[in-house]
């Protein structure tokens, strides 16, 4: 993944081409009169649950009442926290909701605890260290009364009630291992996270920490340099961007980023570049490799297989679902990593196998070179699973590489997107709905609805059975963040980058049904 265009907030740059407990000082609050005042419901993990399904269990929002979804409260970022990081906005994390409190991190690494019912700021942990990997995504985890988060170079734990710092570890990353920019997962006494954009041996690394002390338990390199049968040229990158999957079988699975290489390099010195563009399954206690499934070997398009893996059961078979910017959904056997099916989503221009051809010395390219899905498209945000259906928000955004020595093209073409439903067992597309905008808010299920948000600043919902659009709500700013649904409330971070040279005021907005 390109170091300047990484994670969810990379979108802003592409669109521009085409178009420490302190007193609460980081934001202001407005509350809608007559809105539902509820503190019920939860969204306890980055993707709703440890299986990463993004299915809002216990949600009160459905097809029958979504038309009544109204603004409940708005929290406005102020001061330094409201300043754009790297020109791509202020918010890229997904909210966490536990015990009536919504937790959120901004791209300056500051953490907020807000009342779910009123939006009142309970406490703020001030870091003021801008996220550097993309910037973004980032975010926190909240487990057993402790908030876990990271700044670019350190990991910290806070008391969830007071925001008081419990521990911090500043010695986890070595030179060349990149920086932190991921929403961690916490389970079984361990904190799982990763670095991004490693530039030296090992590339980005996967880590597990002791949740009580912050001490390193294990570390796994996502780039190998001497494995039998692997010709890895050590160009760096790799690592993971999205929250990993912690499974009941004692494993943890990460979606890994791309190798940092040009088309010219991939053609002249082809390499599988393990474990880039793969889902990597490790023993959760030891970090030992169990299996991997590589979507694109020898990738030179900055594709990534970065989406949070999802745990599922397909006709009695434990499976893992993965996906990424190459525009494919993959289903793998959870025990072996064997690929069961893969399905293309979104638009493709016939060059899906270029990396495979280069690996076999059969690819010839000339610039300019049009890439679709582009490096800012495909499956950029996380998928959802409910019942026997997988829901995917897909971005169609081509990139033009004007030189084969570029790592990333600089000219974006016409942009569009869709939300699709796939059968869990077969991968067959059940419905495909086009949208007027870029769906980068992750797919999220609420009863018989599927929600996402559009980059341009719209919350949107679909009929889960048919794909028909049934709800739209204009947001106060552009958005790069996933939403969270807790009970009767939808929380939407709206703090994305500029559009047409203009930028709104970054806010965290809650909508609720009566």
Predicted regions and their residues:
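Bacterial N-terminal signal peptides that target proteins for export
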Residues: 2-18
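Bacterial N-terminal signal peptides
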Residues: 14-28
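Sec-dependent signal peptide cleavage junction
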Residues: 26-36
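Aromatic (tryptophan-biased) beta-strands that constitute blades/sheets of beta-rich domains
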Residues: 37-86, 120-129, 164-173, 215-224, ...
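Repeat-blade elements of multi-bladed beta-propeller folds
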Residues: 40-50, 87-110, 132-155, 177-206, ...
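Inter-blade boundary loops/turns of WD-repeat beta-propellers
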Residues: 63-66, 100, 116, 160, ...
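Conserved blade-register residue in beta-propeller folds
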Residues: 113, 157, 208, 279-281, ...
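Acidic, glycine-rich loop-and-beta core segments that form the ion-binding/anion-interacting portion
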Residues: 274, 280-284, 290, 302-361
């Amino acid at each position: 993944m390109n170091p300047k265009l990484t994670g969810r907030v990379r979108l802003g740059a592409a669109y521009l081409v085409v178009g420490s407990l302190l007193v609460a000082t980081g934001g202001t609050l407005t509350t809608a009169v007559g809105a539902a005042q509820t503190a019920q419901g939860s969204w306890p993990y980055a993707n709703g649950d440890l299986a990463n399904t993004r299915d809002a269990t216990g949600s009160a929002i459905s097809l029958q009442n979504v038309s009544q979804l109204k603004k409940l409260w708005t929290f406005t970022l102020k001061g330094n926290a409201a300043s754009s990081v790297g020109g791509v906005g202020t918010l890229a994390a997904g909210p966490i909701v536990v015990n009536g409190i919504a937790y959120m991190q901004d791209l300056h690494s500051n953490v907020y605890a807000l009342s779910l019912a009123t939006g009142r700021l309970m406490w703020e942990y001030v870091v003021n260290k801008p996220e550097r990997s993309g910037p973004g995504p980032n975010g926190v985890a909240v487990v057993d009364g402790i908030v876990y988060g990271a700044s670019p170079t350190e990991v910290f734990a806070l008391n969830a009630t007071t925001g008081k710092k419990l521990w911090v570890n500043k010695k986890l990353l070595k030179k060349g291992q990149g920086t932190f920019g991921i929403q961690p997962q916490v389970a079984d006494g361990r904190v799982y996270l990763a670095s991004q954009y490693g530039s030296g041996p090992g590339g980005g690394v996967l880590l597990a920490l002791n949740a009580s002390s912050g001490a390193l338990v294990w570390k796994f390199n996502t780039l190998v340099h001497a494995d039998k049968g692997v010709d890895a040229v050590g160009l760096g990158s790799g690592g993971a961007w999205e929250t990993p999957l912690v499974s009941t079988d004692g494993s943890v699975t990460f979606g890994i980023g791309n190798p940092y290489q040009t088309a010219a390099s991939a053609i002249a010195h082809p390499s599988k570049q393990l474990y880039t563009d793969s889902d990597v399954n490790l023993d959760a206690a030891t970090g030992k490799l169990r299996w991997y499934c590589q979507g694109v070997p020898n990738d030179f398009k900055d594709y990534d297989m970065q989406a949070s893996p999802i745990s599922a059961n397909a006709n009695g078979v434990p499976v893992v679902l993965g996906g990424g910017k190459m525009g494919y959904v993959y289903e793998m056997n959870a025990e072996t990593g064997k690929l069961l099916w893969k399905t293309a989503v979104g638009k493709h221009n016939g060059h899906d196998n270029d990396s495979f051809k280069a690996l076999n010395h059969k690819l010839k390219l000339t610039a300019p070179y049009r890439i679709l899905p582009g490096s800012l498209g495909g499956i950029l945000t996380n998928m959802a699973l409910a019942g026997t259906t997988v829901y995917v928000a897909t971005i169609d955004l081509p990139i033009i590489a004007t030189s084969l020595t570029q790592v990333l093209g600089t000219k974006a073409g016409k942009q569009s997107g869709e939300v699709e439903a796939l059968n869990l067992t077969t991968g067959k597309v059940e419905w495909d709905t086009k949208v007027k905008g870029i769906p980068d808010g992750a797919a999220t299920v609420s009863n018989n609805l599927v929600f996402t948000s559009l980059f341009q600043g719209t919350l949107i919902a679909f009929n889960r059975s048919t794909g028909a659009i049934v709800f739209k709500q204009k947001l106060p700013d552009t958005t790069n963040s996933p939403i969270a649904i807790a009970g009767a409330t939808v929380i939407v971070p709206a703090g994305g980058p500029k559009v047409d040279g203009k930028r709104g005021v970054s806010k965290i907005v809650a909508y609720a049904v009566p």
